[in-house]
Amino acid sequence: MGVIGTTVIAILHRAAPLACAAAGALATEYAGVLGIFMEGVITFSSFCIAFFALVWGSYWGGLGITVCVVPLCLFFVAVGTERMRANPFLTGIAVHFSAMGMSAFGASSMFARAAASAMQMDTAAHGVSFTHVSLAHTRVLPHPLWGTAVAFALVWVFHLYLYSTNVGINFMHSGEGALALQVRGTDAARYRMVSWAVAGVCAVCAGGLLVLRVGTYTPQMAAGRGWTALAIVFLARKRMMWCVPAAIFFSGIEHMCDVLQGTHVVPTGVLFALPYILSLVVFVCTRRTSPCRRGERRRSRLLFAYLQRVTCA
């Protein structure tokens, strides 16, 4: 395989978890509650997958228990947010910092007891820190290429579900079209709560792909991908399939940064900060599309045509 083929595969490997994270963030944006918690949940999901994989000796075991626990926890948080009429943005920030804190605590205590033999101790900071865990000895660790293909396929299936089913159409308009759904007798709050669980599933998939690709767990596993996913939502104009090219674009820039690190042309600190800088630029420069714009008018026509069809039936 040539240099170009190797580079393309490397970029696709990087883009797969980012596309999953962007799909989860877009799901919450559709419901009107932007998933500001994606960065922390991805990190916490990576920690849970690595921890249970070390305990049970199976990558699939760690992924299975995490994909059940994390979305369920987010769903309960969403239910509490709706019942208490709390601000979902502030709740999302609290979830983010809580997830980051639990990941750091678990990496320094739980891993030390569960898999001390697999630890690579980092003494560069404050004494001995059990924060870098090798998963090389776990069973049934599949090839990363399969995970990348499955991730893109799941994003495509999610896209088809949203645009091809009545529930998917309701879900897409549960944020901006909440009043229209209420007139029809559908409670938009249910879709808002479900969107948190959907974002949790996508975050677990992103964390699982990161663990699968790297083969280790570190507290910096997410590396800003949660924030980049939020930027992709607006860069892709809230279109599910546009999230994949946007994720590939950001992954290409990330790969370029890794290549430039070996040349010492650009300071390392600037390269590390580049994904965050690009996310900030996208947030500032990308305008939120209003309902009167062409894309929103098309979605509104689809919604009201669907409502008219249901009413006439």
Swiss-Prot record:
Keywords for the protein's UniProt record, in alphabetical order: Cell inner membrane, Cell membrane, Membrane, Transmembrane, Transmembrane helix, Transport
Chief location category: membrane
Membrane topology of this protein: Multi-pass membrane protein
Pfam families noted in UniProt: BPD_transp_2
Family, per entry: Belongs to the binding-protein-dependent transport system permease family.
Protein function: Probably part of the ABC transporter complex RfuABCD involved in riboflavin import. Probably responsible for the translocation of the substrate across the membrane.
Subunit structure: The complex is probably composed of two ATP-binding proteins (RfuB), two transmembrane proteins (RfuC and RfuD) and a solute-binding protein (RfuA).
Protein name in the entry: Probable riboflavin import permease protein RfuD
Organism: Treponema pallidum (strain Nichols)
Organism lineage string: Bacteria, Pseudomonadati, Spirochaetota, Spirochaetia, Spirochaetales
